[in-house]
Regions:
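Alpha-helical, largely C-terminal catalytic domains
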Residues: 1-271
Length: 271
């Protein structure tokens, strides 16, 4: 937050949402060895962890985690515990295991780390040209490159690095970080489409945990359906319901246009 950036800025919510899009694609590149439930929950755990420490600059945050990680994790868990009572399915117990058992979800942690660096690098590519004279910018560039290189610990990372189309797909999705929801209405705070999609995904997952013995595939599908549900808006923008309902049949026409745009622009970027 101490560099010049676009006037809309960057929010932690949108960053965490973008990270989960990267995590999904990296997991698919890795293949069947990924436990998608652990990946989903790990992403939510790390989001909540970052919320508690959100005012700390990233370099300081990473240094603290590296040197005092166990103490910080325990403190964060104690801060979050009272707020987790309403989430069923043993969610908070798994969160404690995620942070206190270093062998738990090891592959999924690697994927989420890589996703974090990719989302951060997407931001940095925007910030860098705006800050050529800012003190320390070249050091940040070097640290970003080193951080990404250090994530080369699983096959899916290398597969993704060699796929121009998948990289373009996730760069395109990044545009949702700048699309304001209900732009003609006053919303405090302002919310953007990408962050909204993550909120829907997390709430869908939490509601799914309340079901009687939900199958793993249902949990996975409910989360990622929520995460991707507004993807066509990267091509059509956020057309609000009052506009869609103002003319009879307009909503159907918009849906047809969205389908057409998905076929022409999005699907060719996917394997």
């Amino acid at each position: 937050n101490d560099h010049i950036r676009p006037w809309t800025g960057f929010t932690e919510l949108d960053k965490q949402a973008h990270k989960m899009f990267y995590a999904y694609v990296l997991a698919k590149c890795e293949g069947e060895s990924v436990n998608m439930i652990k990946l989903i929950e790990g992403g939510i755990f790390e989001f909540f962890h970052r919320i508690v420490l959100t005012d700390i600059k990233p370099p300081i945050y990473h240094k603290l985690v590296k040197e005092k990680g166990f103490q910080i994790d325990n403190w964060v868990l104690s801060e979050l515990e009272e707020h987790m009572d309403g989430i069923g399915g043993g969610f908070f117990e798994r969160m404690k295991k995620y942070y206190l058992d270093k062998d738990y979800a090891s592959l999924e942690k690697q994927i989420l780390k890589a996703a974090h660096y990719h989302a951060s690098n997407w931001e940095f590519k925007i910030i860098y040209p705006m800050n050529p004279q800012t003190f320390g910018i070249e050091q940040v560039k070097t640290e970003m490159a080193q951080g990404l290189a250090a994530c080369d610990t699983f096959h899916g990372f290398r597969y993704f690095a060699g796929s121009k189309y998948l990289q373009e797909f996730l760069s395109l999705i990044g545009k949702l970080r700048y699309q304001q929801r209900w732009a003609k209405a006053v919303r405090m705070p302002e919310t953007f489409v990408m962050g909204h999609m993550l909120v829907v995904a997390i709430l869908s997952y939490f509601m799914s945990l309340e079901l009687d013995n939900p199958c793993r595939k249902r949990l996975e599908n409910n989360f990622f359906s929520g995460l991707f549900h507004d993807l066509p808006e990267v091509l059509t923008r956020d057309i609000v319901s009052p506009v869609k309902n103002s003319v009879k049949g307009l909503d159907s026409i918009i849906s047809e246009i969205e389908d057409e745009q998905m076929r022409e622009v999005i699907y060719p970027l996917l394997p």
